[in-house]
Amino acid sequence: MEIRHSFDVKKCILCAYFVTFFAYLIIGFVPAGATDYIVSARISIPAINLLSDVTTLEKDGRTLHTPDTIVGSYSESENKTLLIGHSSTVFKNLDEAEVGDAIWYNGHGYQIVETDTLLKSEINMDKLLKPEETDTLVIMTCAGEELDNYDATHRLILTAKAV
């Protein structure tokens, strides 16, 4: 008895398309290039297995709108950058980062020198964005108890200095 197998390239490509599409619908998988963000940099924190694209943000009055699935960057000076992202997506493991962990951002090395968790009402954005003498990253995400509209009671803030 002979068994014949046929291979149809068109069916295979169509199948791969549908698998990707349904993965996107079911688990939120987004194929590369499927967002409206312009990638301006990349960030890596190896200790927590973080690797993400970064897009530059513009202020809307006094508000920064956090991207859904990647990191957003904002800077008012050459040597201090604020990076923000959602704790439910890109920064889901950020609370596991520790003082001393390495960060690679835009081709430069940094080391975490401070971690802090503050009430949302205690955040002073002017202080967070104030220029410093050395290159500094400030990374912020939601923490604490979840509130409505994808918000939370606290903010986890990591400060990293260039090495």
Q: Which residues are covered by each model-predicted region?
A:
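N-terminal Sec-pathway targeting helices
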Residues: 1-19
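Solvent-exposed, non-transmembrane regions of membrane-associated and secreted proteins
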Residues: 14-163
